[in-house]
Amino acid sequence: MNTETTNQQTPTQESKPSTRPPLPPFTRETAIQKVRLAEDGWNSRDPEKVALAYTIDSRWRNRAEFPHGRQEIIQFLKRKWAKELDYRLIKELWAYTENRIAVRFAYEWHDDSRNWFRSYGNENWEFNGNGLMALRFASINDLPILESDRKYHWPLGRRPDDHPGLGDLGL
């Protein structure tokens, strides 16, 4: 028996080329769509699903962490959502160019002691021609809040279409 033939690996998500519309060059409308798709993905809190929006060798700076590649991104997100419970996020387009998008965002979460936080931040994204994010730079600050000060009350998952955005909420 030829072991080379029987031990061949099947293609994985790492080796399959993928496209993630909308694709660059972005218009205002497609940049807004891209931001909402990213928000929806992150609100799923599914690290494997979220990681598919990034290139195989995507580079991040998230606070003081520097994940590189999908596998490190998945591990980072698993740690994040194990700590940031009942996570709900709103993103808003700030600026865009041909293949770059800047967003501002705020998300609410609590720790395992039920201490609530609202985290504010900005992200800069750069996309390849297939619409996958190759670079992500995020700056984030956490503000402790009272549970009664929460503004995000939708059921876990995707933010409803009729829910106010950041500007509407005064954030």
Residue spans for each PLM region:
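Short solvent-exposed beta->alpha transition segments
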Residues: 59-81
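Short, aromatic-enriched amphipathic alpha-helices that serve as compact interaction elements
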Residues: 27-44
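Short, well-ordered alpha-helical segments enriched in acidic and aromatic residues
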Residues: 44-57, 61
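A beta-strand edge to alpha-helix "cap/lid" segment located at domain peripheries
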Residues: 2-26, 75-171
